[in-house]
A protein has these predicted regions:
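Extended polysaccharide-engagement surfaces of secreted carbohydrate-active enzymes
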Residues: 42-194
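Active-site lining segments of carbohydrate-active enzymes
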Residues: 1-46, 143-157
């Protein structure tokens, strides 16, 4: 938030803005590295929504204001993290709730932004499908809406996914059957995070 505010008034206080942005670019890398190597996170899909939302705000603000995100958006784990919430959704879109996540159907507008940014049809296609199924929309959907993949075939996505460091595996029998079978398992230490 403070970084985006600094960008808004950068022409008036360039030295202070520069210091704020340098520190922000350095410090945001730590939470972004938590998605390494394959996009999985130690906390649940609700926290992915929260964390990725503010990452996307920051990256988008840098790109739109300065023409670069200084390589932050190319961090492999973050780039692939759009799969995390998707894969943790059951065929009826209910989330696998671990680590204080909500038990609800979930999809977020960040999928539109990530779909455009990383040219990933499945990110935008999943969000488009979730909105059609009644998942709550928000103002960011208007800002980042991407209908290029509205006809994306969800069944082209893998049915199973293993997030290595986060020790989460998901399995399903299909993507488009709202009553289909799906399961997710979380391994790891009970002393980690929540």
């Amino acid at each position: 938030g403070i970084s985006i505010g600094a960008l808004a008034i950068a022409e008036h206080i360039p030295e202070i803005t520069s210091k704020i942005l340098c520190k922000a670019i350095e410090s945001i890398q730590l939470p972004m590295k938590a998605y390494e190597p394959d996009g999985g996170g130690f906390e649940g899909p609700t926290y992915w929504d929260y964390g990725s939302r503010y990452n996307v705000f920051f990256l988008d603000a840098l790109e739109n204001s300065l023409g670069t995100d200084f390589g932050l958006g190319s961090m492999e784990g973050f780039r692939r993290s759009g799969d995390f919430q998707i894969q943790l959704s059951a065929t009826n879109l209910m989330c696998f709730n671990f680590s204080d996540s909500d038990v609800k159907a979930m999809s977020t507008a960040q999928h539109f932004w990530m779909g455009k940014r990383y040219d990933q049809a499945r990110y935008s296609g999943f969000r488009y499908m979730a909105l059609k199924r009644g998942v709550e929309a928000n103002i960011l959907d208007l800002l980042w809406f991407d209908d290029r993949f509205k006809n994306f075939d969800l069944n082209s996505m893998p049915l199973d996914k293993y997030f290595r460091v986060a020790e989460i595996v998901t399995m399903r029998d299909s993507w488009d059957n709202g009553k289909g079978f799906s399961v997710a398992l979380k391994g790891g230490s009970s002393t980690r995070v929540h």
